[in-house]
Amino acid sequence: MRNSNRLFINSQLGFIITLVAVLVMSACSINVKKNENGEDKKVDIETPVGGLHVSKNADVRDTGLPVYPGARVKQKDDNGEEKSANVNISSGLFGLKVVAIEYESDDPPEKLITYYADKLKKYGSVLECHGSSNDDDVDVNEHDSKDSNKLKCKGNNTGNKVELKVGTEDNQRIVAVQPAEKGKGSTFALVYVQTRGKDTI
């Protein structure tokens, strides 16, 4: 008798889950905007529980930082990978916003580091971290104490890539500067990350 009740409850539960999934998906709205070349430039997805918005046309004003004088937006690489993005995920439980844009400059990294260390000061104490060009140091961690919300340098803090960080784990601005791969000059990224929720994503 218990097994038949459990089987009945499981089948009812399965039916309810399927019904909810169908209702959620049918209430889902997807909007894709393309550029003049037919490439996707903006995607908006709305569901009853939240939304996802992705745009390849990030606006530098959303980072809260100026563009270094004379710098140029870095073009797509050989793989066709975009060099800017604006991602926004929102729901009643959590949210995540990331704005990132890559640039290149003819000036050496030291000049850019000095420039952005000064510009970041208005947001608080600036942390300087060092790493290799393979390190991606944007961390959004669950924090269990007030100290764990502070920004930190990761790894052994050595290398030719410099990251200037300001803010907290759930509201940070990052400038990542490194020597250009070919020739002289620099490449750099301006990044803004904001999260919200009981436990950070």
Spans of model-derived segments:
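An acidic-aromatic pocket/loop used at catalytic or ligand-binding sites
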Residues: R2-Q12, C28-I201
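Bacterial N-terminal signal peptides
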Residues: G14-M25
